Amino acid sequence: LRAGLPDDKKIILFVSQKVTDERKGMSFFVEAIDKLVAQHPEMKENTVVAILGGHSEDVAEKLSLPAFPLGYVSDEKTIVQIYSSADVFVLPSLEDNLPNTIMEAMACGVPSVGFKVGGIPEMIDHQKNGYVANYRDADDLAQGMYWVLEEADAEVLKSNCLQKVAHNYSQHAVAMNYIEVYNQAMAYKNYSL
């Protein structure tokens, strides 16, 4: 077991502070899992879902794959173990700016699947470090999960995730972005005087 999860199965991870929050798209996640199993019944034997967050038990019974409701976890080390155990992270948010959960998954080398909404398409480079599904499209969400789990090169995805975080979301990268914005603002101010 990895973080209380089976190590002989592929793991689909869903994370939210409150998994029943409609904005997090749980209904689309449940529908996409149903479609995934209907199109690829063999996945029922080798794939499970881990749900991290409050009210995870309420959702686990709705899924057509075996589910591990992990509840709310605050211990950082345990959270990292859970992310690192996953093969794909799915965030079907209906509205989100720059979700920390995608950064957290990528920092653990886990590719993400999410809808084309808000800042998600800026974080996930389609079919490079994850899959960007059409907005509110459970079929495409299912296709994204299948692509990551069965078609893509897992090592390439992992490497691309780690590179994306290092280049875009590390403290150094963020500081450099702030310096660039500051320099542009100062140049504009001097220009307009």
Predicted feature locations:
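A short, well-ordered alpha-helix in the C-terminal region of glycosyltransferases
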Residues: 155-168, 177-180
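Aromatic "clamp/platform" in nucleotide-sugar-dependent glycosyltransferases that forms part
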Residues: 94
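Short alpha-helical donor nucleotide-sugar binding micro-motif in glycosyltransferases
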Residues: 81-86
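Conserved acidic donor-binding segment of nucleotide-sugar-dependent glycosyltransferases
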Residues: 126-127, 131-138, 147-152
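Conserved donor-binding/catalytic core segment of Leloir-type glycosyltransferases
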Residues: 6-24, 30-33
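Short hydrophobic beta-strand element within catalytic cores of glycosyltransferases
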Residues: 111-114
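Nucleotide-activated donor-binding/catalytic signature segment of Leloir-type glycosyltransferases, i.e.
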Residues: 43-47, 53-77
